[in-house]
Amino acid sequence: MKQPVKQSTAADSSISGSRVLKYQEGYTWQERVRRAYKDESGNWTGVTRTSLVGGSDEIPVPFHLRYFEVEAGGFSSLEKHEHQHIVVIMRGRGRVTLGDHETVIAFGDVVYIAPWEVHQFGNPDGPEPLGFLCAVPAERDRPVPVERKSSDS
């Protein structure tokens, strides 16, 4: 005999340790706070980060899932690191730099970033923010900043 399916609400979104983070207006999620892209200043501007799963919350998983938004004219730091990550574009259009190549990205595109690949996300043209989900290992190294190559050389 089939058991009836219990409908979960925002107030009751935990099921045996599993849970649903309800999406809210404006690319936000219940019980999650949008923060600055990084705690320290650097060569980036107009980027925010929302930790969805893993990190400082109570969900113990071997990966972290975050949502980033890059406002018009904004960009992430140009960096590299040992860990790989996967990005899924959820909103807007922008550009990703992977090594020496720059590619236009838009809703639905998936970006894989290999270990030690120099990379950067940007939204040079706007008008809508570039929003993306990013999955990384919970245990990972710190990014290494990379100096932009001079176009004069």
Where are these regions (language model features)?
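A short, N-terminal "cap"/entry segment at the start of jelly-roll beta-barrel domains
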Residues: 1-62, 146-153
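A generic structural signal for short beta-strands and their flanking turns/coil linkers
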Residues: 48, 61-66, 85, 92, ...
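Conserved short histidine dyad/triad with adjacent acidic residue
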Residues: 49-54, 66-81, 115
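A short hydrophobic beta-strand segment most commonly corresponding to one strand
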Residues: 67, 86, 112, 127-144
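Short, conserved beta-strand element in jelly-roll/cupin
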Residues: 67-71, 80-96, 135-138
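Short acidic-glycine-tyrosine-enriched beta hairpin
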Residues: 100-116
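Asparagine-centered strand-capping/turn motif at beta-strand->loop junctions
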Residues: 123-124
